[in-house]
């Protein structure tokens, strides 16, 4: 008895659950169907009102025609405008035989695109801040070094100039010292000559005095 009652309870629960779960989509489907029916009914009602009244029918027909015409014209206009801006309109139309000689031709040359524009990289020019001359970008750094005297060659030239200046200053100082020594030697020689002349004068005077004394002491 207990097993039978348990099975009956389980079966009753399952039937209740299935009935409860099956009720929800049925209600949703019914609601959706009701909404669809009401929308279709409203559309049919408005259509009958328009058809029954000839004035409304003309307005509806004109509105439908104008909307279709606007869509078609605007679509074509936008497409042509896009082709014109991108340059594809002439490609679609093509070139006449008479205009083929005067029109642009496709260029098939190295370093040129199909329009004949050079694709090679153009050398960029830079302005030297020291001499304000345009110099190519590849030669800007060595030119700036030479122009401002900061390169290796210019540093060597500057060191040579300094060496020559130092040698010139050293030679001038040595020549001045030599002139000073020669001048000092000439002064000493002049002093020696003057003293020797003075001694000679003194010796000649002494000899004269001695001779006069001897002559005075003689007896005749």
Swiss-Prot record:
Disulfide bonds: none annotated. A zinc finger (SGF11-type) spans 126-147. Residues 160-177, 204-220 have a biased composition (Low complexity). GO terms for biological process: chromatin organization; regulation of transcription by RNA polymerase II. Residues 1-38, 160-220 are annotated as: Disordered. Pfam families: Sgf11 (PF08209). InterPro entries: SAGA_su_Sgf11, SGF11. Its main location: nucleus. Belongs to the SGF11 family. The long N-terminal helix forms part of the 'assembly lobe' of the SAGA deubiquitination module. The C-terminal SGF11-type zinc-finger domain forms part of the 'catalytic lobe' of the SAGA deubiquitination module. Component of some SAGA transcription coactivator-HAT complexes. Within the SAGA complex, participates in a subcomplex of SAGA called the DUB module (deubiquitination module). This is SAGA-associated factor 11 homolog. The lineage of its organism: Eukaryota, Metazoa, Ecdysozoa, Arthropoda, Hexapoda.
